[in-house]
Every structure is written in structure tokens, then in C-alpha cells.
């Protein structure tokens, strides 16, 4: 399996944490331990992650301590990541954002002052739109995508826009209506302008769309 394929599989696994409840505790906590280590290298061993039940069907998280470890609890991986972000903000006075991080953390992390329990507002926390994918994300590599996925989870997002494979849907629909391969790809906009194609504002701009891009989108699914 080549590196690109491994990255695709990892992308799908991480993306799936936004959509599924936490049934496999070990797998789900492992994903968030890895997130913690990416955001704050060297600190993941100071945390203990626990899966808890939802609060009357609503996502919930807790931040607690036992004198030795920082205890993060949540009913989903996203809830656990949200607890991690809350702890960084309000106990460590740290900050993680798109434009820069303030992560001046002591070697030994401080204990929370008291147990904090919070319900996450909204069953579905939606993020991104078509334009996001073409303005910036069309050119992201795996490292940048992983950073964005971590940021989404830490900010409670559980329903990001998922456009992977949409190019293939358009392409195969056009073939169904007797477009040739060349005609179909010429009709489709290039990756940097796909959003406006999907919103039916333009066609063909920046194209023809390479078949390799269409095939790549199918591998992601």
C-alpha cells in the first residue's frame, strides 16, 4: 500500500469520528489520544480518556482530574476532543486557532479546579460550504487536512461538508446522458472552481477536469 493510499484510509477513519457514536471505546479514545499528541506533543500521557453515556440523547463532555491525570470524558470522540479544547482554553489559558496557537504549557499540566460537565448545543454541528473546498482546500495536502480535522473535532463539529466523489457523480451522470468522456470532462470545472460548478454558477471553467482527479475522488470513498 503506497503512502497516498494510507493517507486516504486514515482520512476516512478520522472523518468517520464526526459521524458515529462512540461504540468502540478503545478505538475512539486511541484516535483522540493521537489528536492530543499532534496538538500538544509529549502531553498525551498526562490524560485519561473515558467514554460516557449521552445526556438525554444529547452529546456531553466532562473535564475532571484525579490529582495525577487530566480526565476527559465524552460520549463520542468529538465530545472528547471538545473536552480537550475546553481544558486548554479555560484551565491552561491556551489557544488553538487557524491563524496560530498559544500553547505555552508547563511540563506538568495543571489540574482542573473542579469537575466541569457541559452539554453540546445542537444535535448536528455543521461546518464548511462548497466555496471552502475550492478557495483553499483544493490545494491542501494530508498534513493540512489532518490539522483541519483536529480543529473541527476540538470545536464540536460532527457534520462537515463531504464533497469527495461529487466530481465522479457529475461525470457519470453526463456519461449517462450520452456525453463522451472528453465532452463530460470539458463540461466540468477544474478543482479550483468546482464549488461554483456544484452550485450551478458556471461550467467548464479551469477544465477540462483530468480523469485522474475523478478517479482519485472515488478511491477516497
Positions of predicted regions on the chain:
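Bacterial N-terminal signal peptides that target proteins for export
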Residues: 2-11
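Surface-exposed cap/linker segments adjacent to membranes
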Residues: 24-25, 38-40
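Feature activates predominantly on carbohydrate-active enzymes
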Residues: 34-35, 41, 52-56, 65-219
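Hydrophobic h-region of N-terminal signal peptides that target proteins for export
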Residues: 15-23
Amino acid at each position: 500500500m503506497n503512502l497516498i493510499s494510507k493517507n486516504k484510509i486514515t482520512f476516512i477513519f478520522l472523518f468517520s469520528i464526526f459521524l458515529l457514536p462512540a461504540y468502540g471505546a478503545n478505538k475512539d479514545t486511541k484516535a483522540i489520544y493521537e489528536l492530543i499528541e499532534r496538538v500538544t506533543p509529549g502531553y498525551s500521557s498526562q490524560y485519561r480518556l473515558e467514554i460516557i453515556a449521552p445526556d438525554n440523547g444529547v452529546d456531553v463532555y466532562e473535564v475532571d482530574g484525579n490529582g495525577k491525570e487530566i480526565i476527559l470524558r465524552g460520549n463520542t470522540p468529538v465530545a472528547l476532543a471538545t473536552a480537550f479544547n475546553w481544558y486548554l482554553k479555560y484551565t491552561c489559558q491556551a489557544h488553538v486557532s487557524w491563524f496560530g496557537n498559544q500553547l505555552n504549557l508547563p511540563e506538568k499540566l495543571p489540574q482542573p479546579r473542579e469537575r466541569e460537565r457541559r452539554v453540546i448545543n445542537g444535535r448536528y454541528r455543521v461546518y464548511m460550504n462548497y466555496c471552502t473546498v475550492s478557495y483553499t482546500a483544493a490545494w491542501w495536502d494530508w498534513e493540512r487536512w489532518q490539522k483541519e480535522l483536529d480543529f473541527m473535532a476540538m470545536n464540536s463539529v460532527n457534520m462537515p461538508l463531504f464533497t469527495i466523489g461529487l466530481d465522479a457523480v457529475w461525470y457519470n451522470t453526463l456519461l449517462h446522458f450520452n456525453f463522451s468522456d472528453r465532452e463530460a470532462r470539458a463540461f466540468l470545472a477544474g478543482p479550483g472552481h468546482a464549488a461554483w460548478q456544484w452550485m450551478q454558477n458556471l461550467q467548464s471553467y479551469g477544465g477540462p477536469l483530468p480523469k485522474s482527479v475523478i478517479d482519485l475522488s472515488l478511491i477516497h470513498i
